[in-house]
Amino acid sequence: TSMQYKDGYYTKREACVIMTCFSTAAFSFIFILTRTCGLEAYFLPAVFAIYAAVIPCAILLPRVWPLSVQKDEYAMESPEIKEDIPEGLSKGQWALKCAVEKAETMTVKKFVLKGVQTIASVWFDVLPMVMFVATTGMIVNEYTPVFKFLTAPFVPVLNWMGFAEAEVAAPMLLTGFLDQFLPVAMANALTAVDTRFFIFCVAIAQIIYMSEIGVMMIRSKVDFNIGKIFIVFLERTILSMPIIWAYTRLLIH
């Protein structure tokens, strides 16, 4: 998405919306995480609950602040993209024609170089940040009361929803901002299956985490700072919670 923005295909607002709302975990990744969390028997219910939450998020969040106020402007250095459809061609025909012309410009050399650049970016940019943020997050969660203090308002909400171990589960709703895997790994400490299922599904539905997506957004020059990223993360969490709670009651009990 960042490359598409730089190439002039998306405006800043479109790029931010796609990065924060139009991404979700693949089935295979969800299955691996269910095994990590001891929920492999609930793989299909988890998929239903997660997708039931992320679709409303994708519909509603682009219409509220801060995504709604992002500027609809293209990158300064990007070439002008012609989007007008010529007369006599349908959208499908014009799209196919553009796709063929674009494919003709790609050579094996360009393809290999682009692949090498992508994997190098993952190895040297993303992985070090993932390890740093995840390790720091685990240390802060295990040895300080920071997350317990910040997530104190969630405890009565989880109690009202009928989840056991609310005080233990509440910090897991916020650690997902650092890395998506943190709440999944921490959920193993929960003995109540419904609470573990709820935390697991919310963690996957949150999508936005600083160890990867957050860092990429900040580096992509779409004018979306860490404060705005955190607000969208909270919005996704708050919107996802009642939906996943309903599915938990329906599918687990």
Regions found by a protein language model. Name each.
Residues 2-40, 44-59, 180-253:
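C-terminal transmembrane helix pair
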Residues 51-56, 93-98, 127-135:
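Hydrophobic mid-bilayer segments of alpha-helices in multi-pass membrane transport proteins
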Residues 59, 63, 147-148:
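Flexible hinge motifs at transmembrane-helix junctions and intramembrane kinks/re-entrant loops
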Residues 63-72, 169, 222, 248-253:
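A cytosolic-side transmembrane-helix exit/cap motif
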Residues 67-120:
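Intrinsically disordered, low-complexity non-transmembrane regions of multi-pass membrane transporters
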Residues 100-191:
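Transmembrane helical segments that form the transport core of multi-pass membrane transport proteins
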